[in-house]
Amino acid sequence: KDELGCKVIAFTMGPPPAEGMLRELMAMGVDEGVLVTAREFGGSDTYATSQIIAAAIDTYGVEADDIILAGRQAIDGDTAQVGPQIAEKLHLPQITYAGEIKKDGNTLTVKRILEDGYMTVKVNTPCMITCIKELNQPRYLSVGGAFEAYSKPLVTMTYETLKDHPLIDKSTIGLAGSPTNILTSFTPPQKGAGMMLEGDGKDTTDKLAGILAAKHII
């Protein structure tokens, strides 16, 4: 926004209290928020969630020079599926794992950060880009920004708002429209501290063999 002077609109799907998160984003500089919320959307997996958010973005409108930005993955499900699925449903090109973005007209040059290096690719707008956290340092909240946030527009989209969109059908949204659902989740037990063996090579080898034998591993 600082470099290009563009308008930033934040979308989120969740219960009504998610408005607070959008207001926080507006206090950090976002120009407008869109809250997608309805009981019909509850229980959605990544497929159904992307279906709903894609319909909301399409209803709001996608312009020729728009860039849709998403995080690499959510911190709860950790699937990294929603961003790419939205791109597919909106028939937009997509780039994942973006660590640097440069814009020249309607062309973006994006540096993708991979496990074993990086890849530089170009894409035309409109497009979807999922970003790693190192891409940018978020602004800090300020008192002035917090007051200003409540004067900025916040749009609420419900099932009634979106029900006529081709992507929205009760068979493809919510729990009923989710191909997957979580049966249970748990926090794994903490592991104890590792054991350090000191000494020369033969000495530590003998100690390790003794420990493994005592545990009936060898």
Residue ranges of predicted features:
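N-terminal glycine-rich FAD/FM-binding segment characteristic of electron-transfer flavoproteins
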Residues: 1-218
